[in-house]
Amino acid sequence: LVHTFHEVTMWIEINPDKKNCIFDPIFIQKAAHESTRLHPSSPVAWRKPTCPVQLPNNKEAKEGDKIIVDLYTCNRDEEMFGEDAKQFNPFRKAPSGQNTYGLSFGLGMHSCIGRNLAAGVVPKEDTNPEDHHYGTVTLILKKLFENKAMPNPDDPPKMDEKTKRPNWGYYPIVFDR
């Protein structure tokens, strides 16, 4: 939620002509998915194969080996998400067969049980905005933007210094009337 709020408000600063996008819930959901791709809640996933498997780096993992998947790096892969993969682009198109939020919610039997609750259902071209399932993150952001929330200019946000992960430790907002 905080990463998406920050990404969108910074994006609007450099794209002021797109400010009205923040009142479109489909746009907000796409922005939430893009932000989730860039800022997965867990930067890695651990898996153990149930049989020997050949990895993409041509190494073989044996049954029971611990395989660490670097989600942070995978979600920023330029071959998968384009030359600007490390940047926030709420209009990014997902590669064929891929999710707009990358691997942030996992896949298959290891997918996050709360994905649809938090992120909603990925919108399609013909999605009806009136009955679409947006997810809680989008709905909260929609209300924040409707009420003119913005970062507090007198009390700037601060990163969490207790972790190496790029997370916000403090992010005050104000409502402009």
How would you describe each model-predicted region?
Residues L1-C21, V137:
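Central I-helix of cytochrome P450 enzymes
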Residues R92-G169:
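Cytochrome P450 heme-thiolate "Cys pocket" and heme-binding signature region
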Residues N58, E63-R76:
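A translation/RNA-centric and nucleic-acid-associated enzymatic feature enriched
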Residues T9-P16, H39, L144-A149:
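A generic secondary-structure signal for well-formed alpha-helical elements
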Residues V53-Q54, N75-E78, S111-I113:
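Flexible loop/turn segments at secondary-structure boundaries
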Residues K19-K59, I68:
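Conserved cytochrome P450 K-helix E-x-x-R motif and the immediately C-terminal K′/meander segment
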Residues W168-R177:
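C-terminal helix/juxtamembrane-tail motif
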Residues D70-G97, F105:
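Conserved cytochrome P450 K-helix/beta-meander segment immediately N-terminal to the heme-binding cysteine loop
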